Amino acid sequence: MERIRSSAQSVAERLDGRKPLVGIVLGSGLGDLADRIEDPIVIPYNTIPGFPVSTAVGHKGNFIVGNLAGKCVIAMQGRFHYYEGYSMELLALPIRVMKLLGIQYLFVSNAAGAANPDFKIRDMVIIKDHINNLPNPLIGPNLEEFGTRFPDLTCAYDQEIREKALAIGKKLKMDLKTGVYFASSGPTYETPAEVRFYRTVGADMLGMSTVPEVIVARHCGLRVFGVSVITNVANVANEQQTYNDADDVVAQAGMITDKMCKLFTELIKQL
């Protein structure tokens, strides 16, 4: 708890009294939303005591605090992953820091592979539920300051916000889909056999992030909204020796950043 308080205090001292309402986690290749934040304060992760540093492709490693759609937001321009060697405790740290800074909502985004054959590259999918194949970030002593020992995840992703997002998508003529996100450790992409298995158990999108952040956010009582950008279609035929590439994932995500920015901005305006 001391590390969380120390990190939060370090950030708070640089905010000039601002209190963010919304925390935003920007996934691979999706960091450009931070460029749309007005009157920004940039806080590099490497200047925050006890904070990890992003090493993944497409993750710049900054907190950006400022105004978006008339609301004060704090955006993570880059997240942390289990495959980088960080503990679940460190993956939970940024969410808890943002909670101490005052956020009430957490918006998460990621670049994901499609297990659902109806999804195609550059589709934007609203996350309605998830399947966790990672260690749970709440294992260990419970931090009562944040929440109960056994939090309920029946409604991990806020239904009211999801409905607003679908209405906005319809208004803006976006072909938004909904799906279940499956989180595995990475850093390897899935084998064709794994893809077939994950699809059988109900997965629509496959990725290596997001779920630990959502679990911690719900433990903290935050309302959560999530979006996956489809950047690759999972290989189930095993016909090609090389099928997935991290640089291509980032490039594909970058092509749809504008669409995601519009959705997030309109949603935040309505909070």
What are these regions (language model features)?
Residues 10, 14-17, 160, 164-175, ...:
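Generic non-transmembrane alpha-helical segments
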Residues 98-102, 199, 218:
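Non-catalytic positions within long, well-ordered alpha-helices that form the structural scaffold/packing
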Residues 208-247:
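Zn-dependent metallopeptidase/amidohydrolase metal-coordination segment
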Residues 104, 204, 223:
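Short acidic/polar active-site loop segments enriched in Thr and Asp
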Residues 131, 135-187:
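Histidine/lysine/aspartate-rich catalytic loop segments that bind and position anionic ligands
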Residues 167-204, 264, 271:
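Active-site/ligand-binding-proximal alpha/beta "capping" segment
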Residues 235-271:
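His/Asp/Glu-rich mid-to-C-terminal helical/loop segments that flank catalytic regions of hydrolases
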Residues 1-153:
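Metabolite-binding pocket within alpha/beta catalytic cores that recognizes anionic/polar moieties
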